[in-house]
Every structure is written in C-alpha cells, then in structure tokens.
Amino acid sequence: MRDSRTSTHLLLVARAFGANGVLYTGRVDKALEERVQKVVDDWGGSFKMEYCNDWKSAVKEWRSNGGEIIHLTMYGLPIQKVIERIRLSPKPKLVVVGGSKVPSEMYELANWNISITSQPHSEIAALSVFLHEFFEGKELIKHFDRAKMKIVPQKQGKKIIVED
C-alpha cells in the first residue's frame, strides 16, 4: 500500500498528463478522491476516479471488453522498443502502476510489461514518462475545459487567473 501523498501525486500526474481516469485498489480513500476532485473542479478537465475492490477482476474485464493492459515495471521491455506499437493499437488502454509487491499474475495478465529504465525508481516517474512518450509530448499543451484557475506562463514570478 502506497502512502497518501504518493497516491495523490500519482493521480495528479495521470490527470495532468492526459489519462481519462483511474481505477484504484487497496482501501477506499474518500479523502484521496476529494483531493483529486477538488483539483479537477479548480483546474478543469474531465477525469474519472473509481475504486476497484478486486484488481484482478478489473484487469480481466478490461481485456475481455477488448482493451489492453500495459503494466509499468522495471522488469519489462524497454519503452523505446515498443511504444510505437502500443501507440498505434486502437484498443483502449489500462495502464497498471504497481506498488512494492506486484503479484506475479499481473505479469501474465498484461499485454505489455514495459520498463522505464531497468532500474528502481518512482512509479510516479514511470507513469509520467510513459504518458509523455505515449502522447508524444502533446500532453504538455493539453487544454482543460471548465477550469476555474489558469496559470499564465511568466519569465519571472507567478500569475494565476481565477474565474468565479
């Protein structure tokens, strides 16, 4: 089980880097859901968050409905060797980011076991790099509809526009 701060950052990265939503497992965390929803309410976009009690059933259901599973792990194939094939596939994607002890079944259920380097590092970094490569950098200029708050890029200082 990852800590609350790491979970929050993982979900914020998913949202900011272009994911449509997340399924999360472990324990129901209403505070986590509220923190992320507040960001969506303030900063815009549509981002769905759903608790899933049984990760294995969710993964199997995703596959049976025609989707593909992309598991980010340091033991997988290097992203640079497979990202183009993943990008070109029309199937809906479920990206799985495991914690410290990923069950061996996950490696078997995944269509793709992908490494973002074959070194230990953060699951937040792995998701960031994967989404950046998947979207070919276009997520960096993504527009978020219904934003109440917007940053105005500055050479120096900070400027935020807040709409009521």
Region locations from a protein language model:
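Glycine-/small-residue-rich active-site loops that bind phosphorylated ligands and cofactors
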Residues: 2, 28, 102, 119-122
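Short secondary-structure transition/capping segments
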Residues: 33-38, 82-84, 126-127
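Long, charged alpha-helical interface segments
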Residues: 155-164
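Structured adenosyl-cofactor binding patch, chiefly the S-adenosyl-L-methionine
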Residues: 106-155
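Long, charge-patterned amphipathic alpha-helical coiled-coil/hairpin "stalk" segments used as oligomerization
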Residues: 76-116
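Short, well-ordered alpha-helical microsegments
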Residues: 32-33, 55-59, 79-80, 103-104, ...
